[in-house]
Swiss-Prot record:
Keywords: Cell membrane, Disulfide bond, G-protein coupled receptor, Glycoprotein, Membrane, Receptor, Transducer, Transmembrane, Transmembrane helix. Residues 65-75, 134-158, 231-250, 313-329 are cytoplasmic. It is found in: Cell membrane. It holds the Pfam family 7tm_1. This is Neuropeptides B/W receptor type 1. InterPro entries: GPCR_Rhodpsn, GPCR_Rhodpsn_7TM, Neuropept_B/W_rcpt. The keyword Ribosomal protein does not apply. The keyword Ribosomal protein does not apply. It is a multi-pass membrane protein. One of its GO terms (biological process) is regulation of metabolic process. Disulfide bonds join 111-190. PANTHER family: NEUROPEPTIDES B_W RECEPTOR TYPE 1 (PTHR24229:SF47), NEUROPEPTIDES RECEPTOR (PTHR24229). Belongs to the G-protein coupled receptor 1 family.
């Protein structure tokens, strides 16, 4: 079950090349012949992402949950990002099995669950990054003005995180509703079965993901940082504010790095949605290969964040070393 949006279409007799997520009902489910290098590379790449993601995000969860001094507002949001990434990497082996078997052997309940988790992966990262950007906006602006942010507490951050999960659940619910098993030419697949006219519903689902999963959160993030830069230019920092600004600069850098990596991984995926909606690309080996590359890039976001924490967060590195040394002792 792979989001290969470059050659998805809302019309009939459109194969998804082993990718069932997003295929409309009535589409041809016959497996496309994949080039041998691609047939080998895709499960290997997915397997590496799964292994690295599970190890890295497990380490992040372990450090953030076991170290009292790591219980900060920013780390609450980082913890939830790690939970979302860990959840996705836990089910990635099912995607690998689906790719290798070229059919869905896991039943309809699992089909709906995996589709939902896949969509959680699509929406949750940018939603939490939008919240983290809003938090950075408030903190940096308050620091520049030598004041505190009222109500910015660990408990409030947890409440906001729960609200984000609730919102993402509502957003991904339609995908779980439409997901079901469909069989054609002897192949059972987990697909999104849209009502008639299926072309309309398919396009609506792609626009839904593009707008709610990318355009709105990215626009919000850009607006926050643009407004922040404009306001900072108009403020003269006193010595106390400059000291606080230096102390918080590393956290802001970490959030900006996480955001940059997320956009790098997810922008091609959402741009490919625009291509799929506006063009009718032939299903050539090159197009299929590009589609799998874009999908793999979006999946890779789930395993990259722990490396950012390790390189950019001194507290995380120290806490991880201490916990590892304690367990060794």
């Amino acid at each position: 079950m792979h989001n290969l949006t470059l050659f998805e279409s809302g019309g009939d007799n459109v194969s998804c090349g082993g990718s069932s997520l997003g295929c409309p009902n009535g589409s041809s489910l016959a497996p496309l012949p994949l080039p041998q290098p691609l047939a080998v590379a895709v499960p290997v790449v997915y397997g590496v992402i799964c292994a690295v993601g599970l190890a890295g995000n497990s380490a992040v969860l372990y450090v953030l949950l076991r170290t009292p001094r790591m219980k900060t507002v920013t780390n609450v949001f980082i913890l939830n990002l790690a939970i979302a990434d860990e959840l996705f990497t836990l089910v990635l082996p099912i995607n690998i099995a689906d790719f290798l078997l070229r059919r869905w052997p896991f039943g309809e309940v699992m089909c709906k669950l995996i589709v939902a988790v896949d969509q959680y992966n699509t929406f949750s990262s940018l939603y939490f990054l939008a919240v983290m950007s809003a938090d950075r906006y408030l903190v940096v602006l308050a620091t520049a003005e030598s004041r505190r942010v009222s109500g910015r507490t660990y408990g409030a951050a947890r409440a906001v995180s729960l609200a984000v999960w609730a919102l993402v659940t509502l957003v991904v619910l339609p995908f779980a509703v439409f997901a079901r098993l469909d069989e054609e030419q002897g192949r059972r697949q987990c697909v999104l079965v849209f009502p008639q006219p299926e072309a309309f519903w398919w396009r609506a689902s792609r626009l839904y993901t593009l707008v709610l999963g990318f355009a709105i959160p990215v626009t919000t993030i850009c607006a926050l940082y643009t407004t922040l830069l404009c306001r900072l230019r108009a403020i003269q920092l006193d010595s106390h504010a400059k000291a606080l600004d230096r102390a918080k600069k590393r956290v802001t850098l970490l959030v900006a790095a996480i955001l940059a990596v997320c956009l790098l991984c997810w922008t091609p995926y959402h741009l490919s949605t625009i291509v799929a909606l506006t063009t009718d690309l032939p299903q050539t080996p090159l197009v299929i290969g590009i589609s799998y590359f874009i999908t793999s890039l979006s999946y890779a976001n789930s395993c990259l964040n722990p490396f950012l924490y390790a390189f950019l967060d001194d507290s995380f590195r120290r806490s991880l070393r201490q916990l590892v040394s304690c367990r060794s002792a």
